[in-house]
Amino acid sequence: GTLLLMVGDAATGIAGAGQGERSAKASAEVFNRLHPRLIGSSMLTVYPDSRLYQEIQAGSWREAGEVEKYEELKTLVSHLTIPVTFAALGASNAYQFQGELPGDREALLSALDEIIRRESEDRLRSYRTNLPHL
């Protein structure tokens, strides 16, 4: 038989400032239709040598804040209705976590709430600023 492992990638922050909730809901809708077995989430990190950095400098795109990115993850987890492994384990995530949905949904949401409540934008931004080029 053939083993098909479909992986979805949620690039948290890619929609830009103020667009995280909309982006998360749209991503959840797509994932809910495709039924991947694993959804991996990485946080967008903009480097000075990137085209996106040039767009920020030109004022044509605004980067989402660090706390906003965690709010986006919370919205995504809240709107996933399929059984799936959800993982945010990459170096671009200041906090790594994973769980099986729907069973671990409340634990994941609680962890995200704690990060949103406890962490400052400056501390999370410092992590991102000091992240070596991926």
Report each predicted region and the residues it spans.
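Structural beta-sheet core signal
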Residues: G1-L3, A88
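Short, catalytically relevant binding-site loops at active-site mouths
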Residues: L5-A17, L38, T45-D49
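Catalytic cores of alpha/beta
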Residues: V7-R33
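Auxiliary Fe-S-binding modules of radical SAM enzymes
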Residues: K25-L134
